[in-house]
């Protein structure tokens, strides 16, 4: 019965995608994502008796037309006040990594592929997380891509939790990350939904969350494990920390 519900949801999701005006070169990719998600969902259900929550796939399908696989559609989402605030933290000796179980539709979808509890990762320059940033879907407020985040936003759903870690970083390393984020903010960005499923990147500033975080750490010489950024998952930052480079700070939620 659950398999039939999943199948029905996929059909409706495909119809939604087909009837929504889309860039011509993107339309087949949207349908490919729906088809791939359906096949993967059936496989997961068969092996683990797990499927997406009711309405989850429809929510994802409705958001698909907001994405672009070829163009930068997010520009200037981080205001000057963000950079001013981040500048004040460059001397504190750490960058902060935050893993989130947000209970959102996208998080549940990613969980089908990672089989992990925490499916989003963010970066902040300060302990109070006032400079929280990552790649996300924009929550229907901003365009998918590089966006500021807030603890209240990430933990608004029942059962959502966050795990906070800190990574030692020099002034110059934090500066390198901040300057790179500023560059992306000016050039533009988009969320790498295609790469999330097929592990490809079509343009440099089109990334998903863990790809972005790893790219920033690597840019500053702070990556403490070696992996192609497009293959990095949020929990890799914990599971591949063989030398205990991170310090656990606390749990939120």
Model-derived regions: residue spans:
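Cysteine-nucleophile amide-bond enzymes
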Residues: 1-253
């Amino acid at each position: 019965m659950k398999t039939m519900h999943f199948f029905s949801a996929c059909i409706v999701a495909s119809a939604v995608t087909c009837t929504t005006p889309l860039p011509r070169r993107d339309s087949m990719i949207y349908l490919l994502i729906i088809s791939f998600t359906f096949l993967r969902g059936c496989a997961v259900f068969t092996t683990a008796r797990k499927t997406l929550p009711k309405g989850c796939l429809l929510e994802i399908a409705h958001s698909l037309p907001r994405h672009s696989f070829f163009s930068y559609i997010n520009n200037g989402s981080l205001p000057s006040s963000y950079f001013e605030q981040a500048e004040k933290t460059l001397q504190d000796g750490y960058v902060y990594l935050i893993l989130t179980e947000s209970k959102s539709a996208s998080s549940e979808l990613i969980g089908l592929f990672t089989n992990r509890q925490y499916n989003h990762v963010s970066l902040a320059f300060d302990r109070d997380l006032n400079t929280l940033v990552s790649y996300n879907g924009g929550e229907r407020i901003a365009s998918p891509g590089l966006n500021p985040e807030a603890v209240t936003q990430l933990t608004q759903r029942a059962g959502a939790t966050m795990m906070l870690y800190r990574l030692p970083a020099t002034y110059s390393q934090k500066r390198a990350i901040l300057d790179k984020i500023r560059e992306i903010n000016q050039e533009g960005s988009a969320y790498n939904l295609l790469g999330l499923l097929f592990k490809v990147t079509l343009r440099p500033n089109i990334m998903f969350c863990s790809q972005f975080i790893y790219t920033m750490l690597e840019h500053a010489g702070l990556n403490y494990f070696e992996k192609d950024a497009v293959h990095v998952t949020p929990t890799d930052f914990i599971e591949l920390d063989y030398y205990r480079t991170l310090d656990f700070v606390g749990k939120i939620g």
